[in-house]
Amino acid sequence: MLSPTNSISKTVPAPPQDSSKPVLISEEPQNQLLQKVARTALAVLLVVVTLGLILLFYSFSDLQSFPWCCQTRPSTKEHPTISIPEPLPSPPLAVPRPSTPPPPVISRPSTPPAPTPAISPPSTPSAPKPSTPPPLPPKAPKPVKTQEDLLPFVPEQVFVEMYEDMARRQIIEALVPAWDSDIIFKCLCYFHTLYQGLIPLETFPPATIFNFKQKIISILEDKKAVLRGEPIKGSLPICCSEENYRRHLQGTTLLPVFMWYHPTPKTLSDTMQTMKQLAIKGSVGASHWLLVIVDIQARRLVYFDSLYNYVMSPEDMKKDLQSFAQQLDQVYPACDSQKFSVKIAAKEVIQKGSGSSCGAWCCQFLHWYLRDPFTDALNDLPVDSVERHENLASFVRACEAAVQDLPELFWPEAKALF
């Protein structure tokens, strides 16, 4: 039984729900969902706009250089936190150095490590293992030579001297012209009028280094025949009669033998062929006039080369002429048994700065010798080449003016001695 004082609780039944009406979502959760979607769309829009602005102001290569740009690089080590860039490797040594102690190993304990004792190097270096040879040092790049490096360095003073030498040569060539065989023969004819003892030997065809000895011997043989009253055996000159030639041989005491020389031909026939070719071209080329004076009265052979050693060295030429002088002593002996002597006239290059004045220099030296055969006029030559050729030019003008009145390529008439 229940006590009457206790209140009796009654349960009120719930009203019945209509099953035909749909269940609606509450308005508060719906508003939260819309806010999330709007914030997400706004964030995406801001990201897109930011990337678009970045693309407008930077190129693709600039984007790659940014530190946040993703670049995949192969890595052999895994770093737990931050990857530290490795330093550039130093070039390996060709030969290991055992004397250098290895670097101490640094450990990273929680407490400071004790100092590691230094390891003393071994007394003798250990040889590298044959299986692992030491790496070779990198080869240094070859220096690239430019066109300026290939050309030798020429000082400025050399160019100045070359310019002065060219100007000096032009002045000298304008002062003294080249003399051919015709002018030289006319000059000899003019000298004969001044010195009757000189015989004007023809210079065409001229003597050469291959036949000048035979020509001298032939003239001396003909002179002996004339003195004996015998007919001459040698060939007569082209522009001289036999009677006039005999008178010249009878009274001559000096033979001026002009030699034409070219360094290329090695025989007499080749020399004559080269002479013809240069005459057709109208050029002197490398030809050169030489002079051999046969002084019969003084018993002397005088050799003059204005280029000093163009044919051969003066020592070799003197030996050759001394041998020839012994031969002349037998061909044309003296009454008092005096022997022929040899003299090399030039002691240096006379025609400095000129390549075509050799013929004029030979005539100038012959003129000096005719005036005084015992005085060496070459010792009084000016040192300056221009001044030296100016003096030669005055001699050339005097000779050219004197030979104008002489007949063309005809021997002057010699006077009979008895």
From Swiss-Prot:
Its main location: secreted. SUPFAM superfamilies: Cysteine proteinases. The chain crosses the membrane at residues 40-60. The keyword Secreted applies. One of its GO terms (biological process) is protein deubiquitination. GO terms for cellular component: extracellular region; host cell; membrane. The keyword Calcium does not apply. Residues 1-23, 75-145 are annotated as: Disordered. It holds the Pfam family Peptidase_C48. The active site is at 288, 305, 358. Its EC number is 3.4.22.-. Residues 1-10 have a biased composition (Polar residues). It is found in: Secreted; Host cell; Membrane. This is Deubiquitinase and deneddylase Dub1. The gene is cdu1.
